[in-house]
Amino acid sequence: DAVRRADAFGPVHRADVGEIDSVMWVSVQCARRMLTHSTDRDILALFVDRVEEGALDGDMLLLVRHGKAEPRKQWTGTDDKRPITPRGASMAYSLDRELACYNPTRLITSPWLRCQQTIQMLSWQTGLPLHTAEPLTEDAFAADPEAAWQCFHKELKNTLQRHSATAVCMHRPVIGGIFGHLRELCATKSLMKRLISSSPYM
């Protein structure tokens, strides 16, 4: 896995040994006492929160919104062929490295061009094929939001069965609809609040 995602992940620079006194395993309570910087204590607190929410037993499904696309008003072709802009391509390049941190082993995308272009580089660099899902297009979602959810839910179940990460690239309206269903699956109200209720701009 590490070899496959090396190009997407980018170079990893070793820490300056002069900044490391020693490496040791300690309890959370002990680590909290040892940390002298407030930012480090904040990171530890976030880690503890995630563990208490069950993150160690969880699997990763990454929701990706396509990069900045050509404005609808300026595009003369059909909406499914509207490409990402140079800014969108830059966003896709940056996103590539972010996604590689999670080591997805399955890539799903709306077949519309802007979604495919956003996640295509990760596919090229890892050798993973792109699987297109017609129900996740904007038009398909507008016509049948339940079919879009069923398509996404199938990928969610596959991810849980395989115990490996999946990345799904789609459109803002579709993500908003998916969030509505995901809120119903949340085990706690605090977890539910993390899924914003308005249409997400990501």
Tell me what each language-model feature is.
Residues 1-34:
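Unchanged
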Residues 26-55:
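Short, structured interface segments
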Residues 27, 66, 171:
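Short, conserved phosphate/pyrophosphate- and ester-handling motifs at nucleotide-, phospho-/glycolipid
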Residues 41, 50-52, 56-144, 176, ...:
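Active-site-proximal alpha-helix that buttresses catalytic centers in soluble enzyme cores
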Residues 53-54, 153-202:
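Active-site-adjacent alpha-helix immediately C-terminal to a catalytic or transition-state-stabilizing loop
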Residues 131, 152-153:
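Non-catalytic terminal regions of proteins
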Residues 144-151:
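Short, surface-exposed amphipathic charged segments that create phosphate/polyanion-binding patches used
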